Amino acid sequence: LAHDIKTPLTSVIGYLSLLDEAPDMPPKQKAKYVGITLEKAYRLEQLINEFFEITRFNLQTIFLNKGKINLLFMLQQMADEFYPMLTPQGKQVSVNVPNGLTLWGDADKLARVFNNILKNAIAYSYENGVIDIAAEQQDKNIVITFTNHGNPIPQEKLETIFEKFFRLDTSRSTNTGGAGLGLAIAKEIVNAHGGNIFVQSNTEKTVFTVVLPQK
């Protein structure tokens, strides 16, 4: 969970640093950065509260507050929030989602899922690489994929990657920390929505796939 908390904290520090280093920043851009910083600070508070919730309850019993979700808006906004983490190593996020693609789900909890997956994709991708996020409708489901190029996950680790306290660091070198709850939490949230999450990794490409019912 420390890994999850570090993500919004890094964004807050990154955007505040940009604001501090550029006092003459255009007002519109400054307002955007301040807004993102405040949002991530609130997100940090939510994660801390969720930590205590997780210690008391089984995730499968958590109530889902479902509503209509605009996937393009959610995923593009998430990519923008990771900007401070991407630029130091020349990484980018490409979002390819059709306009108007929606699904019915808990926006806050699914944002947690997508944040966890993107965070790992960024951490384990090569410098100057591009992380591709795509979504499409397949029958009655929405399929979202996160693709990054970097050191692969060993095949023997793929079956346990969504277990609590599993650490990707044991198989792939990175500077990230954490207790290894992020992907386990993601799986529980996806399952609660009646969906599925899985990963494929070979050579130098890793793809996380989330399948969710549209309604």
Language-model regions: role of each:
Residues 177, 182, 186:
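Short alpha-helical Gxxx[C/S/T] motif in the catalytic ATP-binding
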Residues 194-195:
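Conserved glycine-rich
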Residues 121-122:
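Short helix-loop "hinge" at the ATP-lid/N-box region of the Bergerat-fold HATPase_c
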Residues 153-167:
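Short conserved segment of the HATPase_c
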